[in-house]
């Protein structure tokens, strides 16, 4: 049985780097603002990407425009959709039935829920996270980019802790790397 406080967290399998810390912060933000739907967003400076864009009007999230539906002007928007959503469960099952496949790909876009919720005066917002955490991995090139970013972050982390890395680019870490005294 669904209660008034139940929340659904939508996660895609192609975002392996999202952390518990980020998800927890997004869920706290969702509760604090008493939202009905929240989208985890990210700033992507490389405009040649396949992410949906978040259209903001008057400082508020207005809708998400999927890649195939974007105009040239919309492709310039750097605020992108990670694919992660937080939704009050009591609304989800009612509103999901309202999604139509009236788009170029004739697909049912879950992101259309944003516009549906807004039109029905529900509280909708977005929560920003780091690109590396929410970057989708759809092919070997994406995986290589994510690994490169991870290695750069780990090198910076250990350098800040005072670890000597004579040639940082030649050092590779795993997620569970522990380094003792230098």
Question: Residue ranges of each PLM-predicted region?
Answer:
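Generic secondary-structure signature for well-ordered alpha-helical cores
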Residues: 4, 31-32, 59, 90, ...
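A general structural signal for well-ordered alpha-helical segments in protein cores
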Residues: 23, 61, 89-92, 110-111, ...
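A generic structural signal for well-ordered coil/turn residues at beta-strand boundaries
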Residues: 50, 60, 80-83, 130-131, ...
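Short hydrophobic-aromatic micro-motifs
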Residues: 63, 84-87, 135-136, 165
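A short glycine-threonine-serine/GTX helix/turn-capping micro-motif
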Residues: 73-86, 100-104, 132
């Amino acid at each position: 049985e669904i209660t008034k406080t139940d929340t659904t967290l939508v996660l895609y399998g192609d975002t392996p780097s999202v952390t518990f810390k980020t998800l927890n912060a997004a869920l706290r933000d969702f509760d604090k603002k008493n939202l009905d739907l929240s989208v985890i967003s990210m700033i992507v400076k490389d405009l040649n990407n396949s992410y949906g864009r978040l259209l903001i009007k008057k400082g508020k999230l207005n809708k998400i425009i999927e890649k195939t539906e974007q105009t040239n002007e919309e492709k310039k928007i750097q605020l992108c959709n990670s694919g992660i959503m937080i939704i009050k469960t009591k609304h989800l099952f009612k509103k999901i039935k309202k999604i139509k496949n009236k788009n170029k790909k004739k697909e049912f876009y879950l992101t259309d829920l944003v516009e549906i919720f807004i039109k029905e005066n529900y509280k909708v917002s977005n929560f920003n996270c780091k690109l590396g955490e929410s970057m989708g991995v759809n092919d070997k090139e994406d995986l290589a980019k994510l690994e490169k970013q991870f290695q750069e972050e780990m090198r910076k982390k250990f350098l800040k802790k005072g670890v000597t890395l004579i040639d940082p680019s030649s050092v590779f870490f795993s997620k569970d790397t522990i380094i003792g005294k230098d």
